[in-house]
């Protein structure tokens, strides 16, 4: 019995060290948000010059897409420098009719598509071959609302030399439920301590699935080919492998609708976790090799990011081990100490692993 207790204790502290090291990495990198940004990491203001295509993949979105299109029609950007394209796929409602009524152009998928990544791949190929006049592509989800200055600020990023950029993703419905409030807090923390911090470090921000811009040159050079359930972070991994910095554009704001119920949130988080693990299996080795060989910091950073679901599982194992250890006669003082430690870990993991 004593030997078993010693083994469990060694395992617990070993895993605890792994978790806290992971937390410490994000804590330290997050502190760079308070650092003064260097000139090379700043986005300057420019006159609108970039012609952009706004791409919206839509599946049965007739109830929400109209609001997005109205906000896009109100952009503080020359009308001759952007067009809105809606790509209906597998729809059984009148999404296409609503989009047309708001002035959007329609691209019909002529190949079978099962995911947003499939739709984007088809659309990018279509745009390169049929609409070469556009210099950049903006991707939105159909339930978004876009700030009037969005395109102008993304134009600034493109003119500043960035070829991929992520917006400031905010929440459209933060007060509708405690779930949507948690999402709102998460994105505030992620934008500040992750994206803005990395922008000041000269690293890459994350891509959050909506409100991001890709230069036409990037698509022409490498295409857009994703196979996992999370096409956004998979594309971010591909950018890291190619030393393509992703800018964070704080003043380009997208308001995104968040889940209201725990079941809806669980379904979404499950998909994100599965997709992240798929990306980890596919890219982690390549990212670490790229970091070791070429010294690209965002490759290392992205490799650690993919470990988030694993860290969540390890945290559960630690809690379970404590329970078993307690049954075997753990001191009450140790239980209290762990409860305090676990509270601190939970606060950290709310940011790291959400």
Q: What are these model-predicted stretches?
A:
Residues 1-70:
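N-proximal low-complexity "stem/linker" segments adjacent to membrane-targeting elements
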Residues 50-53, 83, 234:
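Cell-envelope/extracellular polymer assembly enzymes that use nucleotide-activated donors
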Residues 1-12, 16, 34-45, 201-202, ...:
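Basic/Trp-rich segment in TM-proximal cytosolic loops or flexible interdomain/linker regions
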Residues 88-96, 111-113, 145:
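A conserved acidic beta->alpha catalytic loop
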Residues 108, 113-130, 148-229, 270, ...:
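Long helical/loop segments within the catalytic core of UDP-sugar-dependent glycosyltransferases
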Residues 131-145:
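Short beta-strand-to-loop acidic/aromatic patch adjacent to the donor-nucleotide binding site
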Residues 64-66, 93-100, 149:
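Acidic helix N-cap motif at the loop->helix transition within catalytic regions
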Residues 70-81:
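Short, acidic, metal-binding catalytic loop of nucleotide-sugar glycosyltransferases
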């Amino acid at each position: 019995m004593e030997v078993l207790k010693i083994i469990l204790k060694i395992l617990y502290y070993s895993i605890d060290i792994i978790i806290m090291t992971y937390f410490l990495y994000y804590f330290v990198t997050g502190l760079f948000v308070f650092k003064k940004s260097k000139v090379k990491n700043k986005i300057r203001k420019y006159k609108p010059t970039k012609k952009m295509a706004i791409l919206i993949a839509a599946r049965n979105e007739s109830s929400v897409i109209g609001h997005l299109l109205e906000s896009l029609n109100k952009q503080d950007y020359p009308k001759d420098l952007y067009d809105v394209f809606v790509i209906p796929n597998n729809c059984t409602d009148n999404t296409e009719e609503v989009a047309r009524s708001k002035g959007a152009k329609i691209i019909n998928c002529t190949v079978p598509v099962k995911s947003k990544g499939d739709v984007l791949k088809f659309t990018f190929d279509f745009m390169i071959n049929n609409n070469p006049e556009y210099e950049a592509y903006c991707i939105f989800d159909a339930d978004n609302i876009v700030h009037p200055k969005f395109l102008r600020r993304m134009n600034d990023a493109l003119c500043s030399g960035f070829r991929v950029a992520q917006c400031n993703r905010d929440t459209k419905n933060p007060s509708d439920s405690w779930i949507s409030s948690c999402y709102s807090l998460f994105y505030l923390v992620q934008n500040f301590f992750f994206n803005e911090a990395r922008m000041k470090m000269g690293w890459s921000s994350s891509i959050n699935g909506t409100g991001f811009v890709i230069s036409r040159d990037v698509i022409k050079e490498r295409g857009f080919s994703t196979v996992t359930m999370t096409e956004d972070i998979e594309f971010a991994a591909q950018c890291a492998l190619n030393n393509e910095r992703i800018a964070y554009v704080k003043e380009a704001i997208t308001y995104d609708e968040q889940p209201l119920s725990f079941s809806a949130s669980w379904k979404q988080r499950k998909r994100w976790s599965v997709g992240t693990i798929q990306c980890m299996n596919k890219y982690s080795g390549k990212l670490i090799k790229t970091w070791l060989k070429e010294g690209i910091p965002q490759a290392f950073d992205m490799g650690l990011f993919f470990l988030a679901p694993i860290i969540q599982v390890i945290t559960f194992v630690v809690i379970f081990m404590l329970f078993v250890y307690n049954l075997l006669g753990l001191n009450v003082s140790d239980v209290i100490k762990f409860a305090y430690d676990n509270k601190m870990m939970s606060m950290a993991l709310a940011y790291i692993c959400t």
